[in-house]
């Protein structure tokens, strides 16, 4: 520990090098190094723990306060702190590299196992191909061969998915019989997780790597639908098992999981009999329930296994509960294989294999229950993402949004999602009842006169439901959409709330949170609605879901000659906005909140859910080049690049579900119902208009769209940025071999430094950023325009910009000193230097300001 107690730092004069415990240290030139005593090091370390980068005044104060440092010059102390920070940075970097190395080693092992499995699958397919050729030459011969893991008879390939069909009858109503079922389930699950019992096809875009989610595959030509995932997480197997067993915490479609019986086994495992209910994703289908045997056991190699299957007449076993209005679905052998990794962490294999009884739903909705990609997104990938999220939060690297712990924010997300699912399904046992319709069947109205039963005892509902009596009313509808990508539609609805929302209805919902709500509003064709400000709270690791607060500013509405002018707030959850995520459900759910935003605040979620219906095609859908960079303003009508193959975007279908909830007082229930019914019809009409406007832009550019004045296309802006930088500084910003606008856009988008553009206004807001800029701000192009330049700069940065601003406007550019700024999530970001320059349009008029932050990194 001599190195920890005795520090050598660069100095300017000779100092005494003698110190206790330093006898074993190498001799050094006294003209270059200063030897500190352990007492001096202890004093410096104490200050370093409080302030790693003390100012000059603080260092001088330190010398005055600590007499033992009086023989050391302030400059030498400055160097000591510099070296100490360097050692700390090196230690963190070494630790990070060790972690990455462990991840790569484990991932390499996983890939080798996957390669072995694929080689077995290829060998089997080669064998079966030869057999099929033989059958074609000898059609009269029918042979059964079971030498491989499949059975081929008369040219038909039947996988052994249901050995229970040939299992002899046995008594499974006792622990021994249940253990036999459990052991068979374990063997079948392992053959799917690590063997070739199912033909797995890797999902497009899911590539492995040290920071990737893992290997994701879906089933091909098997009974039911199945999905498989392999990944690495930095949690121990027992913690992973605990998280996975808590299915409602990560499976958003799970309504409840009731463990009815727990039976210990002789090998140290447990058998559980579980009744589970899941929500229906839309109002057009019934919810599902499951009667499941779950078996938890350890393997000889130290792995932990959780496997499960449904108990049916063919498997035997006790009968489960029967609940009206639910369709009984089946879990085929599925589960989780959790293997410990050297150095900590776990390697997880997940298999989800279900038969959702697709024939019980209308034909147009069957892809919802027949698509393995939808299953993968909802269950398999969701489980892996949730575990990685918990691991990331446990590491302490997760920034807190609004001063709240990540677990609290995650609870808000779960409550929003669950509340929306409750509204869509309207279960009678939660207190929901249908109201009589007005003759049309397009909008369903349900009411709940026992809202406390619905929102739960942990929520303070006294503000929401007055003492004079009241409840919750829900208006909901579902519709089919053609040629509208779900992610694109939800992004538009999120960014352009004024296109579909009525400010009077928003005000009514917000007033319900206050002591004296006013009368039910009438719908207006127009009305003053102020700007919408998006305040980020939290997002998941891969930004597939984000929680935010929406502030609706500047409302001015008249109700009974009372003028209201007050900001309103919504808690909003947005997910599934990545157009490249096959089978992903896009959702926008929001609920009014008050300024206090308490942890137990009551939430009445409303919103939209769009689910793709065409899950059978395996071909990747055509996407725009540089999709995020293809338009400067979301919904601004950016030109879409024509695709040579539009067949994948034509004839795509999705189902849209809309549900809006309102509180009511008993004497106003009919009035609120009439308002809600009309409002949902108005929203449906608005969404249909939006869908018609969006759909043509995805059909190979067959219909030209024009950008609003002042909103150039992305490649035009890239050309302006590069040309203006070269004009002002004489240097090339974008080094490309080609002079085409596409290459300029690509070069700017992939530039390693953060490049951003902001408006030339009194309060500049960002209008565009390249990928590095979005990463630095921890945002997306959708939310970028809600971030102002002033918010990300610290005091020193703002002072430097104000000082150099006249120079920027006169000379066209200026260099700003390095410093620290703040991302949208509140994380500090350091940069070595910043460059600001004036971006000129083709007619040499100022269009915007561009900033480049050089060599930025999170602190």
UniProtKB/Swiss-Prot annotation:
Cellular compartment(s): Nucleus
Biased composition regions of type Polar residues, renumbered to the chain: 146-164
Tissue: Expressed in seedlings, roots, stems, leaf sheaths and blades and panicles.
Coiled coil: 100-129
Pfam name, any one: Homeodomain
Protein family according to the UniProt entry: Belongs to the HD-ZIP homeobox family. Class III subfamily.
PANTHER family for the chain: HOMEOBOX-LEUCINE ZIPPER PROTEIN ATHB-14 (PTHR45950:SF7)
CDD domains registered for this protein in UniProt: bZIP, homeodomain, START_ArGLABRA2_like
Summary of the function given for this chain in its UniProt record: Probable transcription factor.
Ranges where the START domain occurs: 171-393
GO cellular component: nucleus
Ranges annotated as DNA-binding: 29-92
SMART domains: HOX (SM00389), START (SM00234)
Protein's name according to its UniProt entry: Homeobox-leucine zipper protein HOX32
Keywords: Coiled coil, DNA-binding, Homeobox, Nucleus, Transcription, Transcription regulation
A GO MF term: lipid binding
Superkingdom of origin organism: Eukaryota
Spans annotated as Disordered: 7-31, 146-172
Transmembrane segments: none
């Amino acid at each position: 520990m001599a190195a920890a107690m005795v520090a050598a730092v660069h100095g300017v004069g000779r100092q005494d090098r003698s110190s206790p415990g330093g006898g074993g240290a190498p001799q050094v030139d006294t003209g270059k190094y200063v030897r500190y005593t352990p007492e001096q090091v202890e004093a410096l370390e104490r200050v370093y723990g409080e302030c790693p980068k003390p100012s000059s005044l603080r260092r001088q104060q330190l010398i005055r306060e600590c007499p033992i440092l009086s023989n050391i010059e302030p400059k030498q102390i400055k160097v000591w702190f510099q070296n100490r920070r360097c050692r700390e940075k090196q230690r963190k970097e070494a630790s990070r590299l060790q972690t990455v190395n462990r991840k790569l080693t484990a991932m390499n092992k996983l890939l080798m196992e996957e390669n072995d499995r694929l080689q077995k699958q290829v060998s089997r397919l080669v064998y079966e191909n030869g057999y099929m050729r033989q059958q074609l030459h000898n059609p009269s011969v029918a042979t059964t061969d079971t030498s491989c893991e499949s059975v081929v008879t008369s040219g038909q390939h039947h996988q052994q998915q249901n050995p229970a069909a040939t299992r002899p009858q046995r008594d499974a109503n006792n622990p021994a019989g249940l253990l036999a079922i459990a052991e068979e389930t374990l063997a079948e699950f392992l053959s799917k997780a690590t063997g070739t019992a199912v033909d797995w096809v890797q999902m497009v875009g899911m590539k492995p790597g040290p920071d990737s989610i893992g290997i994701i595959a879906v089933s091909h030509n098997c009974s039911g639908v199945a999905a498989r995932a392999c990944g690495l997480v930095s949690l121990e197997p027992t913690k992973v098992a605990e998280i996975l067993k808590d299915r409602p915490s990560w499976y958003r479609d799970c309504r409840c999981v009731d463990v009815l019986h727990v039976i210990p086994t002789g090998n140290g495992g447990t058998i559980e009999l579980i009744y589970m209910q899941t929500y229906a994703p839309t109002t057009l289908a019934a919810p599902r329930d499951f009667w499941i045997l779950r078996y938890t056991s350890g393997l000889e190699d130290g792995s932990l296994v959780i496997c499960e299957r449904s108990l049916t007449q063919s498997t035997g076993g006790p009968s489960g509960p029967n609940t009206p209005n639910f369709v009984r679905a089946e879990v085929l052998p599925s589960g989780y294989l959790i293997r410990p990794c050297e150095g900590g962490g776990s390697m997880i294999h997940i298999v989800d294999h279900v038969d959702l009884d697709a024939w019980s739903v209308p034909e147009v909705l069957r892809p919802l229950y027949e698509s393995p990609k939808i299953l993968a997104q909802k269950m398999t990938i969701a489980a892996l993402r949730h575990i990685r999220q918990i691991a990331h939060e446990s590491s302490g690297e997760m920034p807190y949004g609004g001063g709240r712990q990540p677990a609290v924010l995650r609870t808000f997300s779960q409550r929003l999602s669950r509340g929306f699912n409750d509204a869509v399904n309207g279960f009678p046992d939660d207190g929901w009842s249908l109201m009589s319709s007005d003759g049309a069947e397009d909008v369903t109205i349900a009411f709940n006169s026992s809202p406390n039963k619905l929102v739960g005892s942990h929520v303070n509902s006294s503000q929401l439901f007055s003492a004079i009596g009241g409840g919750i009313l829900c208006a909901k509808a579902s519709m089919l959409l053609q040629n509208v990508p779900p992610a694109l539609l939800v992004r538009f609805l999120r960014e352009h709330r004024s296109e579909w929302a009525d400010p009077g209805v928003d005000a009514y919902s917000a007033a319900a949170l206050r002591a004296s709500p006013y009368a039910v509003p009438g719908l207006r064709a127009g009305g003053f609605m102020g700007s919408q400000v998006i305040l980020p709270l939290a997002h998941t690791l891969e930004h597939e879901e984000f929680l935010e607060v929406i502030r609706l500013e500047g409302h001015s509405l008249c109700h009974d000659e009372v003028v209201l002018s007050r900001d309103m707030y919504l808690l909003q959850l947005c997910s599934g906005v990545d157009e490249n995520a096959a089978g992903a459900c896009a959702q926008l759910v929001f609920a009014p909140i008050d300024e206090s935003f308490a942890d137990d605040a009551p939430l009445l979620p409303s919103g939209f859910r769009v689910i793709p219906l065409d899950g059978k095609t395996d071909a990747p859908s055509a996407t725009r080049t540089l999709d995020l960079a293809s338009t400067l303003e979301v919904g601004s009508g950016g030109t879409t690049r024509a695709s040579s193959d539009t067949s994948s975007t034509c004839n795509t279908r999705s189902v849209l579900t809309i549900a809006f909830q309102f509180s009511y007082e008993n004497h106003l229930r009919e009035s609120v119902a009439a308002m809600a019914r009309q409002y949902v019809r108005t929203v449906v009409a608005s969404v249909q208009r939006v869908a018609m406007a969006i759909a043509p832009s995805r059909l190979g550019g067959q219909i030209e769209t024009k950008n609003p004045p002042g909103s150039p296309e992305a490649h035009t802006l890239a050309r302006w940025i590069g040309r203006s930088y070269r004009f002002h500084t004489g240097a090339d910003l974008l080094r490309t071999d080609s002079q085409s606008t596409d290459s300029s856009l690509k070069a700017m988008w992939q530039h390693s430094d953060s490049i951003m553009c902001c408006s030339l206004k009194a309060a500049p807001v960002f209008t565009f950023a390249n990928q590095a800029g979005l990463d630095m701000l921890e945002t997306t192009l959708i939310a970028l325009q809600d971030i102002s330049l002033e918010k990300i700069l610290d005091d020193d940065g703002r002072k430097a910009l104000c000082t150099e601003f006249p120079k920027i406007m006169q000379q066209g550019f200026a260099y700003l000193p390095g410093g620290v700024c703040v991302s949208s999530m509140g994380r500090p970001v350091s940069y070595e230097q910043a460059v600001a320059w004036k971006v000129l349009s083709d007619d040499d008029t100022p269009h915007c300001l561009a900033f480049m932050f050089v060599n930025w990194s999170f602190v």
